[in-house]
């Protein structure tokens, strides 16, 4: 999901995508959801960010993840206990930050759907041995 530089507001395109993802999340109630926010490597504009209490890209990435969590809860009724938000700052790029297109790709949120620990342990027990 793309964001404007320095922003954690969810854009219209991302809202459409979240609608589809929410349906999947609601269908698989036995799974937890990890939401990771990411940024490009552009330093935060200190003056504008200070008004929003954003100190750096770590803060911004966490706010991006948190905005998705709140959107899923408020618009689709996803249970908060199933959601975890985290920020990765600028340290998990998927593209080069040397171009504007690359920076846009790095301003994103990743959504990872995982089985709960007991389900994961069941999968391990069922795995074939070598």
Question: Predicted regions: what is each one?
Answer:
Residues 4-16, 20, 24, 28-31, ...:
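Periplasmic OmpA-like peptidoglycan-binding domain that tethers envelope proteins to the cell wall
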